[in-house]
Swiss-Prot record:
Cross-link (Lanthionine (Ser-Cys)): 46-51
UniProt key word Ribonucleoprotein: no
Propeptide: 1-45
Source organism of this protein record: Actinoplanes garbadinensis
Domain of life: Bacteria
Modification after translation, per record: Maturation of lantibiotics involves the enzymatic conversion of Thr, and Ser into dehydrated AA by the enzyme garM and the formation of thioether bonds with cysteine. The 59-64 beta-methyllanthionine thioether bond is oxidized to a sulfoxide by the monooxygenase GarO. This is followed by membrane translocation and cleavage of the modified precursor.
UniProt keyword terms in alphabetical order: Antibiotic, Antimicrobial, Bacteriocin, Lantibiotic, Oxidation, Thioether bond
The protein's name: Lantibiotic actagardine
Lineage: Bacteria, Bacillati, Actinomycetota, Actinomycetes, Micromonosporales
GO terms of molecular function: signaling receptor binding
Residue(s) of cross-link: Beta-methyllanthionine (Thr-Cys): 52-57, 54-62
Amino acid sequence: MSALAIEKSWKDVDLRDGATSHPAGLGFGELTFEDLREDRTIYAASSGWVCTLTIECGTVICAC
């Protein structure tokens, strides 16, 4: 590892403020309040149940 790579850290305020991308990935932190509202409708119809079939015992487990 080069000394230059060690020097570049997202904890360094000057580097962080001058950066054009976020270390968590492109588009991180760009959700608006409208995107986060809980009263929005879901995209796909759902009954609220999630079911899975267990291979070991062959039973169906559902949870709400």
